[in-house]
């Protein structure tokens, strides 16, 4: 949580104790095709007609006294290294632009029959960011501690960047909070992959050698997807060409905060170990690119990035691990930090380990791939 949010948070608490509410700013009705600017408030963006229609995930809290409501995108972004609100605006504007080009951005990944049996599945979806040409695809899983899905900062901006590298990108909104029990997010990722593969022609994608990318809890999600017992094999899906993890949760034993959300209220030790990625890597695990920051105050790199490196090295999995001295948690693209450019390195790693003729020619970075 950045300083600006903290200030607003404590201000809102004082107002609550006084029986008052933070005033929501007045917004004129926005034209349907209007683009977002960094000076727009979160509250006004939530009401944008196109973003409402495409069910964009802006921010999970939108009540009248919400501390986020009065912040501009620039203010919201100010707590994350040198990221500016323009990065977030670009992600949202890509949705608006695609919608204007008659692209159906929002995609329901479960059938009506599946949703009828389990209504929580209606809350899992994809947002589609097409490449200009037929290409390989990647599914981006934002973080949020399995309590939220932070697509605004860790989803849409990544999709735009990946489009620029020549890939078709999808941003997954998976089930969170109590709906995440029984590893529902992993099921959602599997359903998303199946949806894309089943609609390959319509979506103009190459079905082979796809990638999955995740941040923080989303990193844990994509990491689990690569495991033999609970991942892609369980759902009879093809093996991903590459897994990409940014400041990811790896050891659930060392960070039990999320366990009750994805396993249930009283998970036993055996269940926790089963979703600890470092404890379940096998020689058939997909090639993996991952990075961590020594200045990450939420997920200690020694318990997560370093432990994953030990596991993949032991199993001779092709991998690339970057450990940044000053990188913090939640910096997404890493703009203005030593981590900036990591997405391009990850794409180069993906291309290097691909046997697909549609691989994008991205400049390759040095890596620590097992021989």
Residue spans for each PLM region:
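N-terminal cap/lid segment of alpha/beta-hydrolase-fold proteins
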Residues: 60-62, 67-133
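C-terminal catalytic histidine-bearing segment of alpha/beta-hydrolase fold enzymes
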Residues: 2-38, 42, 306-309, 313-371
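Short beta-strand/loop motif that positions the catalytic acidic residue
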Residues: 284, 289-296
């Amino acid at each position: 949580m950045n300083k600006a949010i903290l200030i607003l948070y404590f201000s809102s608490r004082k107002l609550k104790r006084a029986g008052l509410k933070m005033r929501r700013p007045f917004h004129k009705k926005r034209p349907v095709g209007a683009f977002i600017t960094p000076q727009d408030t979160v509250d006004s963006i939530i009401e944008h007609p196109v973003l409402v229609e495409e069910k964009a995930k802006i921010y999970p809290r939108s009540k009248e006294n919400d501390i986020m409501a009065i912040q501009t995108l620039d203010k919201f972004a100010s707590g994350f290294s040198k990221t500016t609100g323009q990065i977030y605006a670009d992600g949202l504007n890509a949705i608006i632009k695609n919608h204007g080009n008659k692209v159906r951005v929002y995609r329901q990944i479960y059938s009506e029959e599946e949703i009828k049996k389990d209504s929580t599945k209606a809350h899992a979806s994809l947002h589609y960011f097409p490449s200009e040409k037929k290409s390989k695809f990647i599914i981006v899983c934002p973080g949020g501690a399995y309590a939220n899905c932070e697509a605004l900062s860790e989803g849409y901006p990544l999709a735009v960047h990946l489009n620029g590298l020549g890939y078709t990108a999808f941003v997954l909104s998976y089930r969170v909070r109590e709906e995440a029990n029984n590893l529902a997010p992993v099921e959602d990722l599997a359903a998303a992959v199946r949806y894309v593969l089943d609609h390959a022609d319509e979506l103009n994608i190459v079905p082979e050698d796809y990638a999955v990318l995740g941040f923080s809890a989303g990193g844990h999600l994509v990491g689990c997807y690569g495991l033999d017992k609970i991942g892609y094999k369980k759902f009879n899906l093809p093996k991903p060409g590459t897994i990409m993890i940014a400041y990811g949760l790896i050891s659930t034993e060392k960070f039990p905060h999320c366990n009750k959300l994805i396993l249930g209220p009283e998970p036993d030790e055996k269940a926790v170990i089963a979703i600890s990625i470092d404890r379940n890597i096998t020689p058939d695990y997909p090639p993996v690119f991952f990075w961590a920051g020594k200045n990450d105050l939420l997920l200690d790199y020694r318990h997560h990035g370093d432990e994953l490196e030990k596991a993949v090295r032991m199993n001779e999995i092709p991998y690339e691990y970057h450990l940044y001295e000053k990188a913090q948690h939640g910096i997404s693209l890493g703009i203005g930090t030593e981590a900036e450019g990591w997405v391009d390195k990850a794409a180069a790693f993906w291309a290097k380990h691909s046997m697909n003729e549609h691989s994008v020619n991205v400049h390759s970075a040095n890596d620590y791939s097992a021989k």
